[in-house]
């Protein structure tokens, strides 16, 4: 889902004459776009703060989750549980895989590319201020926000992680390994970490 401010014009600058910001808001494990939108009601600020709000959804997983199925905690493969393949700490694999270096164990699909392409698509259609591109994530989405900062710091101004964290094994964060990484070493990302 995409929420646009009144000033945003496709394929051009905004009607206010300045570029708009972009916030990608990522839901937590076993949530969806509607539930994160209700929990963190950012769309009410889209017009006054002049930013585009993108609310994508993670893939469905079919593992048991007491908070995600609609049948009182019993696995419901019809609805499943939406998650992000974020880090080795959380959550696409149905739980943390302590310090595993085998990405396939916790990354059954490539959400980094999915979110990267979403940001690129919005940037191609609207004039986005590159100093105002943020990923905000709650819980599993907060882990995914950290992952985006690790793998694509060049496209982000900052992240907000609410009850999320980074990799259990810090060496998996590509931005921290600038010697062996394709990530530019001068790409800095502001981080607001909220826990509680």
Could you say what each language-model-derived stretch is?
Residues 3, 25-26, 136, 194:
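Short hydrophobic segments within beta-strands
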Residues 20, 156-157:
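Short beta-strand segments enriched for Tyr within beta-sheet-rich domains
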Residues 135-137, 162:
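Short beta-strand immediately N-terminal to the catalytic nucleophile in serine-hydrolase-like folds
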Residues 137-141, 145:
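Gly/Ala-rich beta-loop-alpha elbow adjacent to hydrolase catalytic centers
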Residues 17-134, 147, 151, 175:
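Serine-hydrolase catalytic machinery in alpha/beta-hydrolase-like enzymes
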Residues 157-196:
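The feature captures the conserved acid-bearing segment of alpha/beta-hydrolase catalytic domains
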Residues 7-22, 186-188:
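Proline/glycine-enriched tight loop/beta-turn segments at coil->beta junctions
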């Amino acid at each position: 889902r995409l929420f646009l401010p009144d000033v945003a014009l496709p394929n051009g600058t905004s009607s206010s004459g300045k570029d708009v910001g972009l916030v990608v808001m990522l839901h937590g494990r076993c949530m969806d776009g509607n539930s994160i939108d209700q929990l963190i009601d950012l769309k009410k600020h889209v017009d006054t703060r002049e930013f585009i709000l993108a609310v994508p959804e993670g893939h469905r997983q079919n593992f048991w989750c007491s908070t995600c199925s609609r049948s009182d905690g019993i696995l419901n493969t019809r609805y499943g549980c939406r998650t992000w393949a974020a880090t080795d700490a959380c959550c696409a694999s149905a739980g943390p895989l302590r310090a595993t270096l085998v990405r396939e164990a916790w990354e059954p699909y490539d959400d980094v590319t999915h979110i990267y392409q979403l940001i690129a698509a919005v940037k191609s259609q609207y004039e986005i201020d590159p100093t105002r591109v943020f990923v905000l994530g709650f819980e599993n989405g907060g882990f995914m926000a950290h992952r985006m900062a690790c793998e694509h710091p060049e496209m982000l101004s900052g992240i907000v992680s609410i009850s999320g964290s980074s990799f259990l094994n810090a060496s998996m964060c590509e931005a921290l390994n600038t010697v062996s990484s394709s990530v530019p070493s001068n790409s800095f990302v502001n981080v607001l970490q909220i826990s509680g």
